[in-house]
Amino acid sequence: MSAKAEKKPASKAPAEKKPAAKKTSTSTDGKKRSKARKETYSSYIYKVLKQTHPDTGISQKSMSILNSFVNDIFERIATEASKLAAYNKKSTISAREIQTAVRLILPGELAKHAVSEGTRAVTKYSSSTQA
C-alpha cells in the first residue's frame, strides 16, 4: 500500500461542551425548573423601530448586534460615571455624572443630542412621579 492510501482525512477535535443555562427538567422532588431569564433591550429597540419606521422589520442577528451595542454603551457610560464620582469623592452616581460621562464618551453633535434627550427624559419622569 502507498502512503497516501493509509492516511485518513484530518478530523476536527470535538468542541468542549459548555455548561448550558438552566433548562426545563424535572428535579428530584418532581418540580420543573424554569429556564434562566436573559435580560435584553430587544422590546425597547423594537418599539423605537416601530416609532421611526412602522413598516420595517428587524432580523434576530440585527437585534442581537443592537443589543450588544446598547450593552456596550451602557457599560462605558456607567464606568466613566463611576470614575467621575470617585474623583469627586462621592459614593453616588447622579444625573450630573451621567451627563458628563456622555459628553466625554460620545463625539460632538451626538453628545449634544444625547444630553438634550436625557434631560428631557429625566424632566418627563420627574413630572410624572410628582403628579
Curated annotation (Swiss-Prot):
> What GO cellular component entries does it have?
nucleosome; nucleus
Protein name (Swiss-Prot/TrEMBL): Histone H2B.1
Q: At which residues is the cross-link Glycyl lysine isopeptide (Lys-Gly) (interchain with G-Cter in SUMO) found?
A: K7, K8, K17, K18
> What is the name of the gene encoding this protein?
HTB1
What family does the database annotate?
A: Belongs to the histone H2B family.
Enumerate the UniProt keywords alphabetically. Answer: Acetylation, Chromosome, DNA-binding, Isopeptide bond, Methylation, Nucleosome core, Nucleus, Phosphoprotein, Ubl conjugation
What does the UniProt record tell us about how this protein is modified after translation? Monoubiquitinated by the RAD6/UBC2-BRE1 complex to form H2BK123ub1. H2BK123ub1 gives a specific tag for epigenetic transcriptional activation and is also prerequisite for H3K4me and H3K79me formation. H2BK123ub1 also modulates the formation of double-strand breaks during meiosis and is a prerequisite for DNA-damage checkpoint activation. Deubiquitination is performed by UBP8 in presence of SGF11. Phosphorylated by STE20 to form H2BS10ph during progression through meiotic prophase. May be correlated with chromosome condensation. H2BS10ph is also formed after H(2)O(2) treatment, and is a step leading to apoptosis.
Q: Where in the cell is it found?
A: Nucleus; Chromosome
Stretch list, region Disordered: 1-38
* Modified sites of kind N6,N6-dimethyllysine: K38
Known partners and oligomeric status:
The nucleosome is a histone octamer containing two molecules each of H2A, H2B, H3 and H4 assembled in one H3-H4 heterotetramer and two H2A-H2B heterodimers. The octamer wraps approximately 147 bp of DNA.
Lineage, top ranks: Eukaryota, Fungi, Dikarya, Ascomycota, Saccharomycotina
> Keyword Acetylation on this protein?
yes
- Record-linked InterPro entries: Histone-fold, Histone_H2A/H2B/H3, Histone_H2B, HISTONE_H2B_site
Q: Which residues carry this modification: Phosphoserine?
A: S11
In its UniProt record, which GO terms are filed under biological process?
chromatin organization; negative regulation of transcription by RNA polymerase II; postreplication repair; regulation of DNA-templated transcription
Could you confirm whether the keyword Magnesium appears in this record? Answer: no
Residue positions where N6-acetyllysine is found in the record: K7, K8, K12, K17, K18, K22, K23
Q: What does this protein do?
A: Core component of nucleosome. Nucleosomes wrap and compact DNA into chromatin, limiting DNA accessibility to the cellular machineries which require DNA as a template. Histones thereby play a central role in transcription regulation, DNA repair, DNA replication and chromosomal stability. DNA accessibility is regulated via a complex set of post-translational modifications of histones, also called histone code, and nucleosome remodeling.
Q: Which residues carry this modification: N6-methyllysine?
A: K23
Q: Residues bearing N6-butyryllysine?
A: K22
